[in-house]
Amino acid sequence: DSSTSRGLGDVYKRQVGGNAGQPETAAARKIMGQAKASRAYAYYYLAQLFQNSYDPAQPILPYYDGELTETAKVPASQIYALVVSDLTEAVELLDGYARPDKSKIDKTVAQGLLAYVHAGMGNFAEAKVMADAVIASGYPVTTAGELAYPGAGSGFNNVDTPSWVWGFDLSEELGHELIDGWGGMDVFE
């Protein structure tokens, strides 16, 4: 019933039990995996905004564990531990999920995000393991030719470029949905 739903958070709590939930069905595992990957990505994005380079001891963000009480900033190490934990769980939960298109988060997206986070923390060996897993799953490294080609078929202009793991095919049908939401979520764009 959409009249009582409060979005993904409500579905996450009702269908999979929130943070403590143990999803039993494939649908519940998908929801939990995508929710954890989304939360990890949001926290990582915020961490990048409030810290120029990874300093585990620097207090950067408040950490909310489900209680809606005001909380103080916690050290980056605590935020990054949550991010790594969420993405690691997302990789496990999304194993076997076949997404309908590149706009959905699947195991490979979670692995790519985890590689990104490990690289940001200076954990280059772990970043390589995750990046290699993404490449091994069928996403090759973008070639110089794909990047240099001007126009509609180049590496950054087409979601169908083989190396793109996660993205949206921008079209008029999307309206303002992407522009107003996740479309501007990467600090490096």
Label every model-predicted segment.
Residues A47-D55, A98-R99, G120-N123:
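Short coil/turn linking the two alpha-helices of tandem helical-hairpin repeats
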